[in-house]
């Protein structure tokens, strides 16, 4: 394969992996540990 193709596929895989991990962290089981700063702030 051409080196540009390999680089493009590599970058695409990294972007998709980061996006998937972000969605998993935001909506999956680890989201229980996330805190809402607006709920913690009392006025």
Curated annotation (Swiss-Prot):
Mode of membrane association: Single-pass membrane protein
Its main localization is membrane
**Does the record bear Ribonucleoprotein in its keywords?**
no
Q: Where in the cell is it found?
A: Cellular thylakoid membrane
Enumerate the InterPro entries for this protein. PSII_PsbN
Q: Name one GO cellular component term.
A: plasma membrane-derived thylakoid membrane
Biological processes, Gene Ontology terms: photosynthesis
The record's keywords, sorted A to Z, are:
Membrane, Thylakoid, Transmembrane, Transmembrane helix
Q: Which residues cross the membrane?
A: 7-27
One short Pfam name that applies is PsbN
Q: Does the keyword Disulfide bond apply?
A: no
What positions belong to coiled-coil segments?
Answer: none
Q: What NCBIfam families has UniProt attached to this entry?
A: PRK13183.1
| Family the UniProt entry places it in | Belongs to the PsbN family.
Tell me, in a sentence or two, what this protein's role is: May play a role in photosystem I and II biogenesis.
User: What's the protein here called?
Assistant: Protein PsbN
């Amino acid at each position: 394969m051409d080196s540009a193709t390999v680089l493009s596929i590599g970058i695409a895989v990294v972007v998709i992996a980061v996006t998937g991990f972000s969605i998993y962290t935001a909506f999956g089981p680890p989201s229980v540990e996330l805190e809402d700063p607006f709920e913690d702030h009392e006025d």
